[in-house]
From Swiss-Prot:
GO terms for biological process: anaerobic cobalamin biosynthetic process; methylation. Pfam families: CbiD. The gene is cbiD. PANTHER family: COBALT-PRECORRIN-5B C(1)-METHYLTRANSFERASE. Gene3D superfamilies: CbiD-like. It catalyses: Co-precorrin-5B + S-adenosyl-L-methionine = Co-precorrin-6A + S-adenosyl-L-homocysteine. Belongs to the CbiD family. InterPro entries: CbiD, CbiD_sf. One of its GO terms (molecular function) is cobalt-precorrin-5B C1-methyltransferase activity. This is Cobalt-precorrin-5B C(1)-methyltransferase. The keyword Methyltransferase applies.
Amino acid sequence: MPVWVASAARAALRALLGHPFEPNQQVVQPDGGEPLLVPVRSAARLSDDQALAISRCDPGPGLDLTRDLEIWVRVAWTPSADQGLVLMPGEGVGRIGAGGDACLSTYARQLLECTLLPLLPPGQGLEVEPVLPRGRSLAERTSNAAFGVVDGLALIGTQAEVQQSAAPEQLEQVLRELRALVADPGFGGSVALVIGENGLDLARRAGLSPLLKVGNWLGPVLVAAAEAGVKDLLLLGYHGKLIKLAGGIFHTHHHLADGRLEVLTALGLDVGLSLEELRHLRAAASVEDAFQRLNPETAMDLGRLLAATVEQRSQAYIARYGDWSLRIAAVLFDRSRTLRWRGPMAEERFFTLQD
């Protein structure tokens, strides 16, 4: 989605500058890649100091709830050039907590800066306000709330190309990236597999590297990493996703298998929860809700067992396909975006030096 936000923002800025409308806008990629030509629907000045443009999201083939999502972007001059770009979350754009800042990835901000700043006149700053008219209603069909994102959709893309996490083509792309990473002369034998955009953003903030973003095809990627000679692999993801691995589910798309609360309830039995507590877990609305129903000490014990079980089941999974020296570690984050639970291997191989 950030690509279409950037294209609409550029069209609006051009309108504000008095330039004629162009149906395709050049979006500059932060990594220096070939600029993208991204279509926009319309653009117009609203007054002497602000303009509006509209684009429509095209996520490519596959299922995506943002397909044909209309994106409005209003731009306006700011009083001071020192402010640079000022991002204002409009209606339908997710915020970090009620009244908080817009939820956007580093990539999304860099995309806007690379695309817009070269067009700004000297001494001029710009306010950018994306608006997603259907964002609030569509957000109810996502896991945004589980990460503390409220009021709309998060702008958390990390690349211009759309990835379909459940498609075979996505698996092939990840495997190509894995092979390239391992073939790099500077590769040191370890890699962090991150699940989803939130995981990727959090891993970067934690200073973990090298990183490889994966979708739902975790099993084949683990085996491929072992075959490629990776020695230490860290799985980093939201507890509601990685818990499936603790249940032996290694293709994690929700259309294929779930079982999250059942797995958590079984683990609760292992840590000695009472029958009443187990019933509360089984009746919870989500994994996050289940942990919230426990006292902090019990929740910590259960989370640590969950992380350890993810490590154990993942190790057992690759052992079915060969005898490799790969060590698999796991760290899980919760809705507060905190790396909350680490398995024993994660503590030993990835976090000892950081701590």
